[in-house]
Design a protein with these regions (language model features):
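P-loop NTPase motor domains
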Residues: 4-24, 29-227, 245, 284, ...
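C-terminal regions of RecA-like/P-loop NTPase motor modules
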Residues: 187, 239-332
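Sensor-1/coupling segment of RecA-like P-loop NTPase cores
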Residues: 222-239
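Active-site-proximal loop/turn and secondary-structure-junction residues that shape catalytic pockets
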Residues: 163, 200, 235-237, 265
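Short hydrophobic alpha-helical runs that function as membrane-insertion/retention elements
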Residues: 16-20, 228-232, 258-262
Length: 332
């Protein structure tokens, strides 16, 4: 969410900063079926029975639309499924993976949200969904109605969704994570890490089970793709708010290392129960100064002080006084 806070560090280490917002020119096409390089998998595991790439994409799209239209009925979900299949068929794409390729051997041009909108608006039964989708097609968020125009080839990438608000925030967060997850699965021999700030947006009460299951699945299986998943949240209550904390606890249980910073008394008590911390450790957590924390890993707990170098501080600080001092030095 606070991607702009990573901008300085990203630029200083030669990373790629990608802003996703209605005002940005950057776009990730949620309808895009991305080409997977399965060369490594075939070498390691041998050839396997192919799955339908279209079916896999439509499953993800159902999560996207469940966030965009939270009150979607069972009937509308079925009608949406049919509309999605029809939309891809309009581009010559079917459940047969061979249909993804054009005459030149590259993937065909993918549909965009506007193509789905045109299908939905034809029927009175799906017009409500079309009306809601219209904002992303012809309205203030129409930048989402384009082909993907960003690339994830850099070693360090920040996807900034901080300018998205309201219901678009959760939708945008899923959009970015869906794209990153596809990239992470490309090659199991390459190390990678996914950092998700304010993950409660996708696993908390403002989200739903489909999106939360998607996030939890990443934490469960990313090690099998040679990667790591790291998340952060400032509100443990939001983190544990959906389905009695099922997804938040699932992420914690699938995380080898946990870092706990300063917490209020109520939140500290919840953490104590989940992480089996002692009363002394909880007392420390509620009195931690800025920069102090508790690390839990391999059944060990260690109290630490995180110290950044001068350069690191300049790249990541959000402290107002430090920012003023940086401005003063640069203006001299």
């Amino acid at each position: 969410m606070k991607g702009h806070e990573f901008r300085r560090a990203c630029h200083n280490i030669g990373g790629e900063f990608i802003q996703i917002s209605p005002a940005s020119k950057n776009c990730i096409n949620i309808m895009e079926i991305r080409k997977n390089d399965k060369t490594v998998e075939d070498v390691i595991d041998g050839e396997r029975a192919e799955r339908s790439e279209l079916s896999a994409k439509i499953q993800r799209l159902h999560i996207f639309f469940s966030l965009l239209i939270p009150d979607m009925t069972h009937e509308e979900r079925q009608l949406l499924d049919e509309a999605l299949i029809q939309t891809y068929a309009g581009k010559g794409i079917t459940h047969q993976n061979e249909s993804l390729y054009g005459e030149t051997g590259s993937y065909k041009t993918m549909p965009v949200l506007g193509d789905l909108y045109d299908v939905l608006k034809k029927s009175t039964e799906t017009r409500r969904m079309a009306n809601i989708l219209n904002r992303l097609v012809h309205g203030s968020a129409s930048t989402f109605n384009q082909q993907t125009n960003v690339r994830l080839d850099n070693k360090y990438i920040v996807l900034d969704i901080s300018e998205l608000t309201g219901d678009l925030l959760t939708v945008g967060m899923f959009l970015a994570l869906d794209y990153v997850w596809d990239k992470a699965k490309e090659d199991r021999t390459q190390e990678k890490a996914i950092f998700i700030d304010e993950v409660w947006q996708l696993i908390g009460a403002s989200s739903n089970r489909l999106a939360a299951e998607f996030v939890l699945e990443i934490f469960k299986i990313i090690r099998g793709y040679g990667g790591a998943a790291i998340c952060a949240t400032q509100d443990i209550n939001d983190f544990l708010s959906l389905d009695d904390g099922k997804y938040g606890k699932g992420i914690i249980n699938n995380s080898k290392t946990k870092i706990v910073l300063n917490l209020e008394d109520e939140e500290a008590q919840r953490v104590q129960h989940i992480l089996n911390l002692s009363d002394t450790e909880i007392m420390n957590i509620t009195h931690f100064a800025r920069g102090n924390g508790l690390i839990l890993t391999n059944n060990n707990t260690v109290t630490v002080e995180f110290k950044a170098s001068g350069l690191e501080t300049e790249m990541i600080t959000t402290d107002r006084e430090q920012l003023r001092e940086m401005i003063r030095r640069k203006q001299e």
